[in-house]
Amino acid sequence: MKIEELIIDGFKSYAVRTVISNWDDQFNAITGLNGSGKSNILDAICFVLGITNMSTVRAQNLQDLIYKRGQAGITRASVTIVFNNRDPASSPIGFENHPQVSVTRQIIMGGTSKYLINGHRALQQNVQNLFQSVQLNINNPNFLIMQGRITKVLNMKATEILSMIEEASGTRMFEERKEKAFRTMQRKEAKVEEINTLLREEIEPRLTKLRTEKKTFLEYQHIYNDLERLSHLCTAYDYYKLSLKVEELTVQASQKHSHIAEMESSLQTSKQEVLILKEKIKKIEDERMRQMSVSSDRTLDSQLQTVNENITRISTSIELKNTALEEEHGDLQQIRGKAKELETLLRGKRKRLDEVLSVYEKRKDEHQSISKDFKSQEELISSLTTGLSTTEGHETGYSRKLHEARDTLNDFKAEKETNRLKLEGLNKQISLTKPKKAEATKRCDQLNREIDILQNHVEKLKMSLKNTNSDITGEDVLQQKLKQLAKDRGNLLNELDALKSKLAYMEFTYTDPTPNFDRSKVKGLVAQLLTLNEENYDKQTALEITAGGRLYNLIVETEKIGAQLLQKGNLKRRVTIIPLNKITSFVASAERVGAAKKISNNKAQLALELIGYDDELLPAMQYVFGSTLVCDTPESAKKVTFHPSVKLKSVTLDGDVYDPSGTLTGGSVNKSAGPLLQIQKLNSLQLKLQVVTSEYEKLETQLKDLKTQNANFHRLEQEIQLKQHELTLLIEQRETDSSFRLLSDYQQYKDDVKDLKQRLPELDRLILQSDQAIKKIERDMQEWKHNKGSKMAELEKEFNQYKHKLDEFTPILEKSENDYNGVKLECEQLEGELQNHQQSLVQGESTTSLIKTEIAELELSLVNEEHNRKKLTELIEIESAKFSGLNKEIDSLSTSMKTFESEINNGELTIQKLNHEFDRLEREKSVAITAINHLEKENDWIDGQKQHFGKQGTIFDFHSQNMRQCREQLHNLKPRFASMRKAINPKVMDMIDGVEKKEAKLRSMIKTIHRDKKKIQDTVKSIDRFKRSALEKTWREVNSSFGEIFDELLPGNSAELQPPENKEFTDGLEIHVKIGSIWKDSLAELSGGQRSLVALALIMSLLKYKPAPMYILDEIDAALDLSHTQNIGRLIKTKFKGSQFIIVSLKEGMFTNANRLFHVRFMDGSSVVQAR
């Protein structure tokens, strides 16, 4: 393949399109003056061949190849070579059927280069492959001999000459491939080392960690399964036990309900018995009253009965209240214990909440920092890629980042300067304040001591106030009661005074006859000492007629007392005295009285039986009333009086007197109230007055005590208020005191200085950090300007790292947030439970206080009622002493009735306790049912499995398992599970699979690399063997041609290539020259022309060994004289007929041997070529 035509347009000195045609296929010469552009023709050929070393064509860059660097209006350079390709044996691969091959290369201002093959666009590599296939490798050109090449050959070392032989033999290509193979081996070794490093430093540690995590994860799964199994088992056991408890409680509640029904039935029977006994007692009492000879006030019995009923009712109420109080105390104790337990749990949960919150806030800050870095990196990449900011109105890319960093740095510097100025001002203030501090401290200490003393005094007063009882409402109630009692007492006194004035004639007064006289031995008038029941009021006239004047006799204990009164008692009126120890009387026998009752059909009674009196007064009463009958009608009086079996004096209700002697006394009788009735009324009023006075005195004492307590309470309150006011004034005085303000300001200055000093190092660190960030951004900006691709890759790598870090940290933050919310919810639930218990505690304490108040009021009422019962009992005992038989029967019945009433009370208490027990069972049942519902709600699986709970042969066979051990295992597993749950990696199974695959892949790559390395090593050995053989062959042929050509150029002389002494030819070759018969030791012994001929001979011998289709020689004869130049021209013409030579020369001896001569001239600023 040889040049037929060369077309140059705009290339170097060829401004216009220049066509150089008719090239000789063997020997072409180019000549012209210096600077005419002849060498530019060779440069144009090299340009098309694809030269990359611009220095070879004497240019720095492609723009230098355009005519006048494009400044003359020509902006494009184009060179086309048309090759003769008619010889298929020397045709490029793929172009055997093309008789001509045209190759064009064009460049345009700006550096764009374009290749055309036969008019079609082609890649540079395709063009290079085309030329290399015909031994025209322009980047390692053995066909190109430019100016200076001869000098370069002369200065070559042995190894460099060997390289020329290698190039000629073609083994250089093998060497290059060998070097390439070695480089490939080195890369593979580096890759192996990289893989080993990756395996050693990343994969294996990560695999070790993941295998540990996998083991932990598998253990975690095992624990989770055990925990779930044990949790289900314990939950099922709790559910099973609760279900059994509900059934048991249902049975117990049913039994309690039945027991209550039985007790109520029994209680009803006892109440019926009480009613029967009351009816019997009433009949006996009626009979007793009927038998009484004298009427008495029945109000005492009714009052006593009322008082007894009140006492029974109050006692029962107190017992019930005490029972309720005990139960309330028990409930309060349980509530306090539960509240204390909840407080302990809540403290632990709050501590746990603080810990979880701290972790959550720390991770939240870390997440925000990572998110901020991620968004910043995303914004940076987006703005650098698109030139637009995602934040409207802001700068883009590094400019925005740099602006923000500088703003941050300025903010820190401004803060530092501000803090420095503040610190100076504060230090100045401290210096001014410090001298006054001692006096101010003394003043403040004095005020603080006074405040402490006053505060302690207030606390003591509050403690005293707390221990002082106060009842303002009770005082008001007592005052109202006293007011009413005073009113009742006044009314009773008025009635008594009025009645006493009417009975003034019955008033008996005397003076003590002797010193220390015992007035209790003077009993009183007969009329004053007897009592008359209300049912016998209609018999008061008959009794007055019966007593007659004796009604106003004075009863004394002995006749001596009577004598003393008569002698020294200063009696105001005449009086008959009845001494109890001396009086004798006639008393009707029981037989005569019985006969009288029988004859009169119970319309006659002994007068003595109708009245009431003390037992000690019996002789006197017998003396007055013991021998007279009181009859309801005159007929009955007449019958009994004159009946032989009776023969007793009788008095009718109208006052008629029948005497057995035969006399009859009667007539008009005053129907108004007689003295007996008035005396009975007087006695009743006196008794009422006594009860009211006793109650009044008792309440007055209570009121006095209560007033004292309330006064103490009010005094303490007022004193506390006064002292509290003094304390407030003293505290205000301290707050407003200049000394206090000075110390407060001084301490504030110190605290501010401390904070500022702590902040300044932090600001220095932040300023340094910001400054480093700014420098880094500036470096990044410079790197971005010079290498956008690699910088963008680095930014994207950092972005992916941030994204990966954010993706990894987000679940961690979510877990921390879930932990925090969970613990917070538990705290809120505990707080709610604690608040409910505290409310229950307050309500319970209020109920307890109310019950205590009610019990105190009931006990007070009980004391009052017992006092009333005592008074009434004393009066009734006096009244009913003489009815001991009936009384005994009544007592017996009353005892039986009290027994039944006690049974009733006990029964009611038992029923109440049973009701409480029933309510407790119902509450426990409700709690158990609630717990069951809660378990069912929290555990959906229960509904489908509960039929198997407790069944033998199932997983819920509780009898075959130790549930205590199961609970202990569950208790031990929970903290371990909780701790492992925080430590395990849930993605470890997927991760370890990926890492193991990666490890296998990398180890497979290592095996592949080692296998490839072995192949390369085998190939290199084979290449070395082939290279040595080919190199030796080439050396010997070139050596032979070298000697022959040198002999032609310089007849009679010889030259050869030999290895250095004691070395092989593969270590290098040296030029040895023989001038005449003498071998020169060095080329330095030769003349300049001889050395040039030696170099030319070597070059020509190399060209002859493996001829290329074309050779380009640029003024290789510059250092030779004319004869030697002619020899070279002749040598080329005769010895190198198969190749096309293109030679630039200025010597006629050279180009006269050429078959085609091209003459180059420089005209009008451009080169012109003429063929000759």
Swiss-Prot record:
It comes from the Eukaryota. Keywords: ATP-binding, Cell cycle, Cell division, Chromosome, Coiled coil, Cytoplasm, DNA condensation, Mitosis, Nucleotide-binding, Nucleus. One of its GO terms (biological process) is chromatin organization. One of its GO terms (cellular component) is euchromatin. The keyword Cell division applies. Gene3D superfamilies: 1.10.287.1490, 1.20.1060.20, 3.30.70.1620, P-loop containing nucleotide triphosphate hydrolases (3.40.50.300). It is found in: Nucleus; Cytoplasm; Chromosome. Residues 520-640 form the SMC hinge domain. GO terms for molecular function: ATP binding; ATP hydrolysis activity; chromatin binding; DNA translocase activity. Residues 172-204, 258-507, 676-941 form a coiled coil. ATP binds at residues 32-39. SMART domains: SMC_hinge. Central component of the condensin complex, a complex required for conversion of interphase chromatin into mitotic-like condense chromosomes. The condensin complex probably introduces positive supercoils into relaxed DNA in the presence of type I topoisomerases and converts nicked DNA into positive knotted forms in the presence of type II topoisomerases. PANTHER family: STRUCTURAL MAINTENANCE OF CHROMOSOMES PROTEIN 3 (PTHR43977). The flexible SMC hinge domain, which separates the large intramolecular coiled coil regions, allows the heterodimerization with cut3, forming a V-shaped heterodimer. Belongs to the SMC family. SMC2 subfamily. Forms a heterodimer with cut3/smc4. Component of the condensin complex, which contains the cut3 and cut14 heterodimer, and three non smc subunits that probably regulate the complex: cnd1, cnd2 and cnd3. This is Structural maintenance of chromosomes protein 2. The gene is cut14.
